[in-house]
Design a protein with these regions (language model features):
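Short, Lys/Arg-enriched N-terminal segments with co-localized hydrophobic residues
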Residues: 1-6
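Dinucleotide-binding Rossmann-like beta1-alpha1 core, especially the glycine-rich loop
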Residues: 54-143
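N-terminal Rossmann-like FAD-binding beta1-loop-alpha1 element of flavoenzymes
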Residues: 11-38
Length: 196
């Protein structure tokens, strides 16, 4: 099998794994006119894209680590343009939605602690516009009248920068765009070791 990968072609970069992270790296490199080979295992292998919610999440990230907060905010700000470009390149909708990430609180103490933590979190990055609101139960019910709240929900924090994309569509779009850019994918070729 190793010989079959030598295919009379040399590669600038070989990416191990065609999941979301590997596909995103390979997609980006192929955009810089790099000759990229992406190796992957079987279709039945575990993929994070199959198990995650596709969150593009900012609120609360990087508490006590302001650089992580800044990076998360910048990434979320870049997502609409990234999603639109990838959709235009592939014709695959990512089902990207933004503007409402909720973290529910089940007691007054939890809601108060959440508000205090998020206030401190926003204070760590004064250059960033505030993007979080604390909603009590009645505000939640007014804002989301069709949402059925459990009896213990007293409120929530709302991240106005938060969103989500369909992770399976994102994976399909990244892999398709990578191949359109000239990248080569070899499925059924798991990387089991790397030798210098």
């Amino acid at each position: 099998e190793e010989r079959s990968l030598n295919m009379q072609r040399e590669y600038d970069v070989i990416v191990a794994g065609a999941g979301i992270v590997g596909a995103a790296i390979a997609y980006g490199l192929a955009g810089y006119d790099k000759r990229v080979l992406m190796l992957d295992g079987a279709d039945t292998d575990y993929r994070a894209a199959k198990a995650n919610f596709g969150l593009v999440w900012v609120h609360g990230k990087g508490y006590r680590y302001p650089e992580y907060h800044r990076l998360s905010a910048a990434a979320a700000d870049a997502w609409p343009e990234f999603a639109a470009g990838l959709e235009a390149e592939t014709g695959i909708s990512l089902d990207y939605q933004t503007g409402a990430g909720l973290k529910f609180c089940l007691s007054d103490d939890e809601l108060s602690a959440r508000a205090k933590m998020l206030g401190a979190w926003e204070a760590e990055t004064p250059e960033l516009a505030p993007s979080v609101r604390i909603l009590d139960r009645s505000e939640l019910a007014r804002r989301y009248p069709t949402m059925r709240l459990g009896p213990d929900v007293v409120g929530a924090s709302l991240g106005e920068q938060d969103g989500q994309a369909n992770p399976l569509r994102l994976l399909a779009a990244l892999q398709a765009a990578f191949q359109r850019r000239g990248g080569m994918v070899r499925n059924g070729h798991p990387v089991t070791s790397i030798k210098p």
